[in-house]
Regions:
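Short hydrophobic beta-strand motif reused across regulatory alpha/beta modules
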Residues: 42-47, 108-116
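Histidine- and aromatic-rich ligand-binding microenvironments
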Residues: 15, 48-49, 66, 115-116
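Conserved active-site beta-strand-loop modules that form the wall/rim of enzyme catalytic pockets
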Residues: 28-31, 41-42
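The conserved cystathionine-beta-synthase
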Residues: 9-27, 35, 53-56, 74-94, ...
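Bateman (tandem CBS) regulatory domains
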Residues: 1-7, 61-72
Length: 122
């Protein structure tokens, strides 16, 4: 699981030009979108960004909150890696937000399918 500064987190009002740089720098293919209070409001993948760029003429100035997927899939920090992998396979996604037991709207980490596969846990 990636934690702290390794998590690609942005605020809802960030412009796409800056979001694109962050998703590229963090190399996870995903951005977690947070409200001002730190609660997670959405997610955007690199695939989403490619599709959005083709749709909108003024892509660079677009705010991420207008195109993010709301209520991203998340797991409790105590969830087994095999369970997380199963969820990713079922939902056909590559990343899950991770939260503390009592704070399901506050992302504390992100787990990527490759992290699980590289650790040989399945």
């Amino acid at each position: 699981m990636k934690k702290g500064k390794k998590i690609p987190v942005v605020r809802e009002n960030i412009k796409m030009k800056k979001a694109l740089k962050i998703i590229s720098d963090k190399k996870l293919g995903v951005l977690i979108v947070n409200k001002k209070n730190g609660f997670t409001s959405g997610i955007v993948t690199d695939g989403d960004l490619k599709r959005i760029a083709q749709k909108y003429e003024k892509f660079d100035d677009l705010e991420i909150k207008k195109v993010m997927k709301k209520n991203p899939m998340s797991i409790n920090e105590d969830t087994l890696a095999a369970t997380a992998l199963s969820i990713m396979n079922q939902k056909k996604i590559t990343s899950l937000c991770v939260h503390k037991k009592n704070l399901s709207k506050k992302t504390i980490g992100i787990i990527h399918m490759h992290d699980i596969l590289q650790s040989n846990i399945n």
